[in-house]
Amino acid sequence: MKAFTEPLLSLAGFEEMTKTAEKSSGLISVTGCIDAQKSQMIYAFGGHRKNKLIVTFGEQKAKELYDEYSFFDKEVVYYPSKDVLFYQSDIRGNLLTAERIRALKAIREQERVTLVTTFDALMNTCLLYTSDAADE
């Protein structure tokens, strides 16, 4: 994968962005790169980080980013948003529910994980899992 990340490391803008991110904690927002380069940029920028959350504006864009980013990182999962229309959820069956469960399971069980989702899905409420509930 160094063939994809090495060219970025030599760019002054990328180096400055990396230094700024290391000094600060919390959210990192990067804008201005073209769609074809986003997955490569995310991988090079956050490759050393244990967990990554990639949030985008729409369902289609999240799926595209998931497909592209899975080339770089095998520990990537996609968390879809809920269907607003009953018609859409009826067509897909339990696929969205299964994808959500798979993503939540990966977050809970894997040491390293990258989650790709949308703003809508990020705002979904989930029940809190505690180990006490499993004992009952």
Where do the language-model regions lie?
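A short, hydrophobic C-terminal helix/tail in secreted or cell-surface proteins
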Residues: 132-136
